[in-house]
């Protein structure tokens, strides 16, 4: 099947399929004489695996590790569990950071009069960083993380 059919069948966009090939997450597709990519059932199965792992929030590096474990029939389930538990810990850190941001914003919004006056603690906090928020930005996750 061509890339469009593989995309439709797997639920992974053609653009992402090309990207996953480029970064080595999936094997390069076979090519026709006219250089079109062709995919088989195993390729689509792998793409579905990748899509599901992405849906669960695993990083590309974690997916590489999971794919290697999936392909290794002699793997120990404890290795797979370790990847999952590490991911759960990351998710819990993100949740805590988002909850802290929510508390801070609720506090600031509660002190903003929301009227015609220009004074606003939300703007003041963004401009000056004056609120005591115990967080730092983690560029890997795009959210603040607790210090």
Curated annotation (Swiss-Prot):
Annotated GO MF terms: copper ion binding; DNA binding; DNA-binding transcription factor activity
GO CC, one annotated term: cytoplasm
This protein's UniProt keywords: Copper, Cytoplasm, DNA-binding, Plasmid, Transcription, Transcription regulation
DNA-binding positions: 3-22
GO biological process: positive regulation of DNA-templated transcription
Pfam (any one): MerR
Domain annotation HTH merR-type: ranges: 1-69
SMART domains with a match to the protein in the record: HTH_MERR
Superkingdom of origin organism: Bacteria
Signal peptide span: none
Note on domains (UniProt): It contains a N-terminal DNA binding region and a C-terminal metal binding region.
Protein name: Heavy metal-dependent transcription regulator 2
